[in-house]
């Protein structure tokens, strides 16, 4: 089974969210439909990009790294490259 580390962008606010899941479509739908959760405040969300990992453990470690202090520079660079790719068409 494949696991995904993904980046979402809030359409109205421009905020970013990084997460991990085994079902990317279902997870995006949850972010856009749930009420009362942190991510529901800034919906709708759009998928900017994702990475595919072969194990849940690898994906979880990657998500934690990107969300942590040690991954801040890498996180910013990844988001920047995704935004540039989106702007290029």
Regions found by a protein language model. Give the residues of each.
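Structure-specific nucleic-acid interaction/processing domains
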Residues: 1-89
